[in-house]
Amino acid sequence: ASPDCRRVFRYLKERGISGEVLQRCVHLGILYESLPYHNAVFIGRDENQVARYAFLRGIYDASGKSFKMEQAGSEKAYAFCVPAKSGCRRVAVYEACVDVLAHMTLEQRQGSRDKYRLELGGISAPKEGQSQRSMKKPQALEHFLSQDPEITEIEVCTDNDFAGRWACEHIRKAYEGSYRIIENLPEIEGADWADMAKMAARTPEKRQNREAR
């Protein structure tokens, strides 16, 4: 692993993610920069802090798309999770690791309360217009809830597209009898939380450019 995560930090900061959020994840041992390819590696750990899951994201975009891959042997039950700093009864769930960091950054600026933040390891939704099959309960969320009986609220932070709305609806139906469900999708159609963080980071730049004219 790279000793300073310099390239990964630069890549993620350019996408609107705060240095404080990144430093916290590195301190927790759930984010590092791989060598020699300098991928961002997101780690999921079990109850004994043993790494059981890893997701790799390339920092060099080719044709607008970066390399993304779950490490072979990863167990989705132990997907990437940023723990709450203190006792907390809410877990927020996301489609992707970067969405976790992006939403943390946005809420940090607003002074929102602390919560557990869990990546689901992606979702498997039907294509829009196809038959509406049911969704299995996410392994990562099922395992998390089994390990923390104090949780009473699930905040669904999936993407605001067909697949994300489909997943949100099915998670709500699966858990609303036992948990309070909060639906918190990005306000812009088609966006994920990573998109929202990028837009928020660009807004001050646009304002400064206008003022300089």
Regions found by a protein language model. Name each.
Residues 1-77, 82-85:
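Basic, glycine-enriched DNA-binding surface that flanks or lies within the catalytic cores of DNA
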Residues 40, 100-107:
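Contiguous, well-ordered alpha-helical segments that form the cores/surfaces of helical PPI scaffolds
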Residues 88-89, 105-213:
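TOPRIM fold recognition
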